Amino acid sequence: MFKFNEDEENLKCSFCGKDQDQVKKLVAGSGVYICNECIELCSEIVEEELAQSEPEGLTELPTPKEIMDKLNDYVIGQEKAKKSLAVAVYNHYKRVQQLGPNEDEVELQKSNVALIGPTGSGKTLLAQTLAKTLNVPFAIADATSLTEAGYVGDDVENILLRLIQAADFDIDKAEKGIIYVDEIDKIARKSENTSITRDVSGEGVQQALLKILEGTTASVPPQGGRKHPNQELIQIDTTNILFVLGGAFDGIDEVIKRRLGEKVIGFSSSEASKYDEDAILEQIRPEDLQSYGLIPEFIGRVPIVANLETLDVDALKNILTQPKNALVKQYTKMLELDDVTLEFTDEALSAISNKAIKRKTGARGLRSIIEEALIDIMYDVPSSDGVVKVVITAETINDEKEPELYDKDGNLVNKEQTSA
């Protein structure tokens, strides 16, 4: 291809119809012409299509330290759990990327993870942040809604359907996703006596979960619900899906204490009881999970167990202020949109944290506590002219005093006087 001489006449771009004197360059092919403007436009179109055709999802695997750094942006504390999770996830996806002909015949098995910790300690947030960091589909399921085949409730395949939906029905993407199953402790067998008839929400569900945890090709109804004859099913391979199982496991500390008191030389039951709860949970072993009610086969499919600590006042205060999506930052931004400055005193943050601990809701309950304190302010301030600053004190959180409202001159404003 070449550029025609400028003295050529009646030459036009075959695409846009512009004359050669209307463009900078006119390039000729076999009986056709294209101008520089159309070349640039075509180049942009090709680049966009190539970008769209590139597979989404995990492209470059971050190192455990990089995963840890991302978790630190959103999850405060729980250092041991985050480190265990970062290593487990890195090894899992390293295994996924290396699948193929294996010359040394070493088979790398899945590394599903169990997160054990009280309500509001960050189990779900850890799993969500992992999926976001790795740019893979993510789905959450509640184990209490699952039943074994033949009973009213959700089949375990419906867990996979949620992941497929999160991947916009792209099976290749879904097969590299993460599924978080919450309340896994609720499907524990109610007795260690294996001769007892299986209960609908207990051992039977564990048995049903075994295959998809290990890796199998599952048939999933595209509309959810039970399978029906002549129904077209979606096939999905679960071999490379990472399962993160979460549960509070209330009472498992007593199981661990019994084991420490009976089996560890030099420990009596009274000595074992001296451990605080978090220290006890650090001693958790697979046999403790079995004593709690998980069957050995199920425990074997989840080789990595990470313990999350109970969040104290200082940890909850950090959660309120430090993460990128910290609640204090969010509410401050919301009032800022109404040209109002929002401040929380340190005592207010402590009061919020103490109230969450008292309610036994952990970090999960922080938002509702702040919402209770701010609901009237967020209702009144948008229609108030004089208020430019709101200060939340400990008395506000404890329902003893209204928030402090200030005008532009720094004068304390009575709330009733500002209402429209």
Swiss-Prot record:
Q: Quick one: which residues bind ATP?
A: 118-125
Disulfide bond positions: none
Give the binding site residues for Zn(2+): 13, 16, 35, 38
Q: Output one GO MF annotation.
A: protein dimerization activity
> Could you state one GO cellular component term attached to this entry?
HslUV protease complex
Sorted UniProt keywords = ATP-binding, Chaperone, Metal-binding, Nucleotide-binding, Zinc
- The answer to whether UniProt assigns keyword Iron to this entry is no
Organism domain of life: Bacteria
**What's one Pfam family here?**
zf-C4_ClpX
The cross-references to PROSITE patterns, in alphabetical order and at most eight, read: CLPX_ZB
Tell me where in this chain the ClpX-type ZB domain is found.
1-54
Parts of the chain that traverse the membrane: none
Q: What is its biological role?
A: ATP-dependent specificity component of the Clp protease. It directs the protease to specific substrates. Can perform chaperone functions in the absence of ClpP.
| Family the UniProt entry places it in | Belongs to the ClpX chaperone family.
Q: What is this protein called?
A: ATP-dependent Clp protease ATP-binding subunit ClpX
The species this protein was found in: Staphylococcus saprophyticus subsp. saprophyticus (strain ATCC 15305 / DSM 20229 / NCIMB 8711 / NCTC 7292 / S-41)
